[in-house]
């Protein structure tokens, strides 16, 4: 079967490579986002999916707007059986949706967490399970009919990188399953009354206050490595653990100093802070930081 693949980040790149190494599947073209400047030096960097396509010698297109007439004409001129979409970053116009069945791999149990940050939302909400949904795309955002859902459990202390890696493997296998057994699956309409939406993560989302220890820890799980979590002062909490969930404390008060960490109170619960990073400085142990600031038990970390 012939496939047009549309995807951009690592998640998409892994799925693309799985397709390229599967018998009876031919990826005839990749559509991905344009190269973007990255880092302080603004080095023009290709998306992860493009690197895979270059490795395997696949035709690559990087339109700024998939909706442009020229791009739509180009896509619809390519003979294919399916279009597979994974974290592409653009909405597919109706003309392309009609060209071939468009199958999207979304990293949540739809209709929960439609949108740009489903993995982070899973961790922010402390969910104990998540999954990948294969769906037939329509003109809405993650609103298409569901073909199959593969669920996995989420560990209580699992970080975003680990969950991302596991969901990527699930999505890769699910893609092959759905393509090879497409006619066996009956599309199921999503229940919009159960839907929730999630936006793109910004740097500002990483700001925390010592209100709820569980919420802080979940933000840490979701936002490591980026954007990280930090106090209003700019002090970054680089490595933390949830110490306990229920105690009531003064916000930010140092409750205990241990041999490798400090225990910081929240209005509800407390966290163990192992390393910190002040603005414009390197990461350091929490002990080194409080010693430098001459902070002790009952003082406030801020």
Swiss-Prot record:
Stored HAMAP family: Formyl_trans
Top enzyme class: transferase
Domain of life: Bacteria
InterPro entries given in the database record: Fmt, Formyl_trans_C, Formyl_transf_N, Formyl_transf_N_sf, Formyl_transferase-like_C_sf, Met-tRNA-FMT_C, Met-tRNA-FMT_N
Catalytic activity: L-methionyl-tRNA(fMet) + (6R)-10-formyltetrahydrofolate = N-formyl-L-methionyl-tRNA(fMet) + (6S)-5,6,7,8-tetrahydrofolate + H(+)
Gene3D superfamilies tied to this protein: 3.40.50.12230
UniProt gene name: fmt
Residues at which (6S)-5,6,7,8-tetrahydrofolate binds: 108-111
Source organism: Sulfurimonas denitrificans (strain ATCC 33889 / DSM 1251) (Thiomicrospira denitrificans (strain ATCC 33889 / DSM 1251))
GO molecular function: methionyl-tRNA formyltransferase activity
Record-given protein name: Methionyl-tRNA formyltransferase
Keyword Transferase: yes
CDD domains with a match to the protein in the record: FMT_core_Met-tRNA-FMT_N (cd08646), Met_tRNA_FMT_C (cd08704)
UniProt keyword terms in alphabetical order: Protein biosynthesis, Transferase
């Amino acid at each position: 079967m012939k496939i047009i693949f549309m995807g951009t980040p690592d998640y998409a790149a892994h799925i693309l490579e799985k397709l390229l190494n599967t018998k009876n599947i031919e990826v005839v073209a990749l559509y991905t986002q344009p190269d973007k400047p990255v880092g302080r030096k603004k080095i023009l960097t290709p998306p992860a999916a493009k690197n895979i396509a270059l490795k395997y010698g696949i035709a690559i297109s990087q339109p700024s707007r998939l909706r442009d007439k020229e791009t739509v004409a180009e896509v619809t001129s390519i003979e294919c059986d399916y279009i597979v979409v994974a974290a592409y970053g653009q909405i597919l116009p109706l003309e392309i949706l009609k060209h071939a069945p468009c199958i999207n791999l979304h990293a949540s149990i739809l209709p929960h967490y439609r949108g740009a940050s489903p993995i982070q939302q899973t961790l922010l909400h402390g969910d104990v399970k998540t999954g990948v949904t294969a769906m037939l795309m329509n003109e809405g955002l993650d609103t298409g009919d569901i073909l199959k859902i593969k669920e996995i459990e989420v560990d209580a202390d699992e970080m975003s990188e680990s969950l991302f890696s596991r969901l990527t493997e699930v999505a890769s296998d699910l893609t092959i399953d759905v393509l090879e057994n497409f006619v066996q699956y009956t599309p199921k309409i999503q229940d919009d009354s159960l839907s929730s939406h999630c936006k793109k993560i910004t740097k500002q989302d990483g700001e925390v206050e010592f209100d709820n220890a569980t919420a802080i820890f979940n933000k840490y799980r979701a936002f490591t490595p980026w954007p990280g979590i930090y106090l209003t002062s700019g002090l970054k909490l680089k490595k933390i653990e949830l110490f306990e969930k229920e105690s009531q404390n003064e916000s930010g008060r140092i409750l205990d100093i241990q041999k490798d960490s400090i225990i910081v109170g929240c209005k509800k619960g407390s966290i163990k802070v192992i390393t910190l990073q002040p603005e414009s400085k390197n990461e350091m142990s929490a002990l080194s930081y409080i010693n430098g600031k001459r902070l002790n038990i009952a003082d406030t970390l801020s």
